[in-house]
């Protein structure tokens, strides 16, 4: 191991710790990820790993191309969700969730979150559901339980869908899993991770909710009609659901399907303004919505994925994968450990490292396309973030929105989330052992 390899590893470790301690350092993790990426590639370029500028450029462009498929997918998905949200497409959810009993509302919120998270990302789903929950639940003590279950349900719902979580998107784009494979094999473990915590919380909620007001949600703001709202919702959410089908039928990368849905949705909304003034700058026109996309998140993924690519290029991840196989040798334990660690640190770099550690079809049956390790990794990395409230983007956002303390979540939710997590792994093992 030469000096530059040690320097690259040191930069990655320091950067990783800075990202994990973002709440303490108050330095945005996107800035850290980008600097980490540039410094690591700089050491790679000067460390003599490749000969000549042409080989160096080929290495950078090849990895950038692989990373770009995930970034374009995320940007397209974020744009679609933003459009649907601004067109009040999720307003119908509020009507569906109306209930008198606290227990009844718990199950409605839980299942709606679980289902929405399978087609939207868990972060967006959590934000949407928290905003709706606030209109339905007045007592703060109850809201803490509902909000926590939204986190658990969102993470569980995203784990079995190829488009439901950033990590599953990464695995799907990387060719480690297929849409049909991850849905059919991971849905039962995901349900276990969702249903067991829900059943336990069900016993702790008693009584009825205050009657809801009769406020109409038939018409959105900014002059949006109910028809326009419904069209945008069907095209947006229906389009997201159709992306795996598009990928299977055409063989094109998933990001092409996402961009086609985004283009169709953009075109449709422009047609809605056909008879209006061309200079109309309505807040819901796509050109006005694009600046609302979270570019900081996109740059974070760019920095992380390209940094991990450097570690793969210098052979560190392959060596680490071989060491884990020799010392542990059990794909269930490796995936379970990664999931548990993801409750403390960001799961994106963890999954990115695992993808580079185990090349497809070169490390045994568990690591082939739709192999048990990749399916377990999809489940564990997604649901492991529910164990601690800081373990997922959804948890961190809900923590801020509802002012949930780390201590309250740790005492009340961590034990039941851990029980659901372990039950999911056990159910996956039983399904494959039979």
Regions found by a protein language model. Name each.
Residues 1-4, 24-30, 54-68, 179-188, ...:
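Interfacial loop-to-helix junctions that mark the boundaries of transmembrane helices
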Residues 6-15, 26-51, 67-79, 229-239, ...:
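Hydrophobic mid-bilayer segments of alpha-helices in multi-pass membrane transport proteins
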Residues 7, 139-144, 160-161, 170-171, ...:
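Juxtamembrane and boundary regions of transmembrane helices in multi-pass small-molecule transporters
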Residues 40-50, 64-65, 116-123, 127-153, ...:
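Membrane-interfacial helix-loop connectors
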Residues 41, 70, 74, 78, ...:
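Transmembrane alpha-helical segments of multi-pass membrane transport proteins and ion-pumping complexes
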Residues 65, 87, 94-96, 109, ...:
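Transmembrane helical segments that form the transport core of multi-pass membrane transport proteins
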Residues 65-75, 181-197, 250-263, 374-384:
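Alpha-helical transmembrane segments
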Residues 194-279:
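Long, contiguous bundles of hydrophobic transmembrane helices that form the permeation core
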């Amino acid at each position: 191991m030469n000096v530059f390899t040690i320097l690259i590893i040191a930069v990655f470790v320091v950067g990783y710790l800075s990202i994990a301690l973002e709440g303490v350092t108050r330095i945005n993790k996107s800035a850290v990820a980008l600097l980490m990426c540039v410094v690591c590639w700089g050491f790679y370029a000067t460390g003599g790993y490749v000969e000549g500028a042409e080989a160096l450029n080929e290495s950078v462009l090849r990895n950038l191309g692989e990373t770009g498929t995930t970034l374009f997918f995320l940007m397209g998905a974020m744009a679609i969700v933003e459009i649907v949200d601004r067109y009040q497409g999720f307003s119908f959810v509020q009507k569906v969730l109306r209930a008198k009993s606290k227990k009844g509302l718990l199950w409605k919120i839980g299942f709606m979150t679980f289902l929405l998270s399978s087609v939207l990302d868990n972060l967006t789903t959590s934000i949407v559901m928290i905003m709706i929950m606030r209109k339905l639940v007045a007592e703060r003590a109850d809201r803490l339980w509902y909000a926590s279950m939204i986190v658990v349900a969102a993470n569980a719902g995203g784990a079995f869908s190829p488009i439901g979580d950033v990590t599953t998107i990464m695995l799907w784009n990387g060719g480690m899993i297929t849409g049909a494979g991850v849905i059919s094999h991971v849905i039962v473990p995901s349900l276990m991770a969702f249903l067991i915590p829900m059943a336990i919380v069900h016993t702790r909620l008693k009584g009825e909710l205050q009657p809801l007001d009769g406020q109409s949600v038939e018409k959105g703001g900014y002059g949006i009609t109910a028809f326009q709202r419904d069209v945008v919702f069907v095209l947006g959410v229906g389009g997201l659901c159709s992306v795996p089908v598009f990928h299977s039928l055409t063989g094109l990368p998933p990001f092409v399907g996402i961009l086609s849905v985004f283009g169709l949705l953009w075109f449709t909304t422009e047609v809605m303004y056909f008879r209006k003034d061309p200079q109309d700058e309505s807040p819901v026109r796509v050109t006005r919505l694009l600046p609302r996309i979270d570019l900081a998140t996109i740059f974070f993924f760019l920095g992380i994925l390209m940094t991990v690519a450097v570690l793969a290029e210098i052979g560190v991840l392959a060596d680490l994968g071989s060491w884990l196989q020799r010392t542990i040798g059990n794909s269930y334990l490796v995936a379970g450990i990664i999931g548990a660690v993801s409750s403390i640190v960001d799961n994106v770099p963890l999954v990115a490292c695992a993808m580079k550690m185990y090349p497809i079809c070169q490390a045994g049956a568990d690591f082939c396309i739709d192999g048990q390790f990749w399916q377990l990794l999809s489940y564990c990395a997604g649901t492991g973030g529910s164990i601690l409230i800081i373990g997922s983007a959804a948890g961190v956002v809900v923590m801020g929105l509802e002012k949930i303390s780390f201590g309250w979540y740790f005492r009340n939710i961590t034990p039941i989330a851990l029980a659901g997590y372990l039950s999911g792994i056990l159910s996956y093992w039983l399904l494959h052992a039979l």
